[in-house]
Amino acid sequence: MAWRAGVLAPGLAVGWCLAVLLFAGLRLLGQHPGWHVDLVVLILLLMALSAWQLTHLALTLIGRRPAGWQSWQLVWRHKGAWLLVELGLTILALPLGLGGLSSRLLVRLPLPADFINYVGLNRRPVGITVAIIYIVVAGVCLLRGPWVFRRLAPQIRRPGSWRQMVVALLIGAGLMGVWWGLAEGIVTLNWWGDARLAAGLAKGLAAGSLLLIFLGFVVAVILAAITLVWSWCGQPAVSRPIPRRQGWWLVTLLVIAGGCVSAQALESTPQFAAMVAISHRGVDHGVGVQNTLGALRHVSQQRPDYVEMDLHETRDHQWVVLHDENLAVLAQRNATPHQLTLAQLERLTVHENGYHDHLVSWSTYLRTAERLHQPLLVEIKTTPQDSAGAVRRFAHQYGARLRRDGSAVHSLDYRVVAQLKQTAPQLQVGYITPFNWVAPASVPADFYSFQRISVSQQFILAAHQAGAPAWVWTPDSPAAMIRMWALGADGEITNELSRLQRVVRQRPGKNWWAVVQNFVFSCV
């Protein structure tokens, strides 16, 4: 009964419809990076409407049947508190996707490069700290949320208990779970259709699927919101509403909004662009030991655009080709590169995937790659033990040579990126993002290597707006590769190079399912 009253009671249906239209407008305008007046206006309108809708919904559920102006009056009286509440709810909802608005907001977040770099280099302790704070804040909201809401709507006589809040959250999670299951079923249907239907029919199926998924998401979110507010109000008995005839125009507006969002997802560019194929750590399908000459010689036969490999500084200030900061896994020796000289490291045998090989110096690896005419993507690893000026020495010694070879350098440490560009400005230098949470323009680079799990089309578009290619690491399954291709990534860094090369030889028209899948992921 609460769901029916929350949807059909006077004023609420129109309010939900307007909220969906504003939400759709934000998705449409927020697709491309940058702040615009119309985008800010839409955000402010959605915040104001959300406050009114929740207030009007609460008063309706407790049987007050207020006029619309009365709810607006109550919202205006508590406008400061509402602003704080909505900001808090937005922050809590950001990790949950915010209905696809999270990436549209985060890609516009400018922060100092030093702060971004600190978070990236200390991502584990920072991540744990943020997770603890998030859990504490979410717990406080769970326990005190109903009392805060009562202050915003004093007519509520008995606010909900924490048990009622837990039940409401479980119901909301269940609704989203049902939506997710149905959406994945629709994705599977599109995968089946792509393989069997003509190109036009497959694209039409994708268009209809996107519309259904969007409308289903809207319904699930509205019902979850009604359940939450009903629990904030103490789950009162709700009388049967007297619905007003809203007319088909409301349904028509929702379908039009959903159609616009679906069309944007289907037709947005870039999609299925030319792909740069990059072998991760110089390995293809587990043949050879990562970052060794044997693996390099094998993978170069597949002619990747780049072979990605890693460098660590040694105790005698040389460079060894190695990814791990400890040799325990590959060489069964509990030591770091900084504890051994290059000569000692070259004598070590490393084992992986049933193969064995020797560690190799950077100069030897580079000469071998040049003989094979194989461009490299060099990742410079950093530790607190690195010598002062190591990166600048690298740039002076190898910058011009790497540029002649058509090679590039990237790093997780933005200090490396900045120093290389200052010392060797003609060298192509990129920044590796451990996760995607700020405007790429905050950390300028020649290209970006985006972490795959949290990348979105908005981050790829932001990189393109800055004139930088967007590469993604490390999709290994065919499904992940196709999804990144459908997002518009310019390159993929993968452990399965030959698989990626087969994937990008497919016709894009046979992979509309990936566009639908990306849309599902964009909602959460």
Each model region followed by its residue ranges:
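Hydrophobic alpha-helical membrane segments
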Residues: 1-275
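Phosphate-group recognition and catalysis centered on beta-loop-alpha active-site segments
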Residues: 231-524
